[in-house]
Amino acid sequence: MTCVKICGLRRKEDIDYVNLYKPQFAGFVFAESRRKVSKETARMLVKALLPQIKSVGIFVNEKKETVAEIVKYTGLDCVQLHGDETPEYVEKLKELLGRITEKRIEIWKAVRVKNKESLEIISEFDVDAFLLDAYVEGSYGGAGAVFDWQLAADVAAGHERIILAGGLNPENVKTAVAKVKPYGVDVSSGVETDGFKDAEKIRDFIMKVREADGGVLS
């Protein structure tokens, strides 16, 4: 079954929506963005999630100590690194997280896909998952742009945990899942109306993913 991550949650009603439709992951943005949440708000929202929905914190070029502090304070399950973090940064972050929490925290690394060569960096990292997003000049993600899914499909064929992001929405996600066969899909703006999460779009998105998997929404 393809996992679903609904990203950019910032309101209590957003949590109500994901608790109703039950994606596997819920994302909270701590980088500069209109969807950015404070650690206090994130802690409240994470606590309101159903226990089976894992929380993911999105960080861009943040200090390791700050990431670890936020993870401990909010109770996050996963860290998504969406900037220019290096393999050395990842290893040091793992060590730091291991010292401050008994829970194993997953680490995901985002890769901004421009061409085939931009994917070569994957071999340098030891992380739990890679999130493939479209390369957009001057942006670290969340731009709603689509990239060549064939590039993602080629990577997904050789990696168990590839998460597809970038311009996904209820209209195109079924085709994307069928073509790429990723471990998971990630959506933010594609399930929003006027800049806020839309319950019907979240439902439709997850339903289309399940259709691609050959099943139906439970």
UniProtKB/Swiss-Prot annotation:
Which BP terms does GO give this entry? L-tryptophan biosynthetic process
**Cytoplasm listed as a keyword:** no
List the InterPro entries hit by this protein, alphabetically: Aldolase_TIM, PRAI_dom, RibuloseP-bd_barrel, TrpF_fam
Annotated source species:
Acetivibrio thermocellus (strain ATCC 27405 / DSM 1237 / JCM 9322 / NBRC 103400 / NCIMB 10682 / NRRL B-4536 / VPI 7372)
Enumerate the UniProt keywords alphabetically.
Answer: Amino-acid biosynthesis, Aromatic amino acid biosynthesis, Isomerase, Tryptophan biosynthesis
The signal sequence is: none
Q: Which family does it belong to?
A: Belongs to the TrpF family.
Q: Which Gene3D superfamilies has this protein been placed in?
A: Aldolase class I
Catalytic reaction(s) noted: N-(5-phospho-beta-D-ribosyl)anthranilate = 1-(2-carboxyphenylamino)-1-deoxy-D-ribulose 5-phosphate
Starting at the broadest rank, the lineage of the source organism is: Bacteria, Bacillati, Bacillota, Clostridia, Eubacteriales
Enzyme Commission number(s) from the entry: 5.3.1.24
| Pfam short name (any one) | PRAI
Q: Which domain of life does this protein belong to?
A: Bacteria
> What are this entry's molecular-function GO terms?
phosphoribosylanthranilate isomerase activity
Q: Which gene does this sequence derive from?
A: trpF
Q: What is this protein called?
A: N-(5'-phosphoribosyl)anthranilate isomerase
Pathway involvement? Amino-acid biosynthesis; L-tryptophan biosynthesis; L-tryptophan from chorismate: step 3/5
**Record's keyword annotation contains Amino-acid biosynthesis:** yes
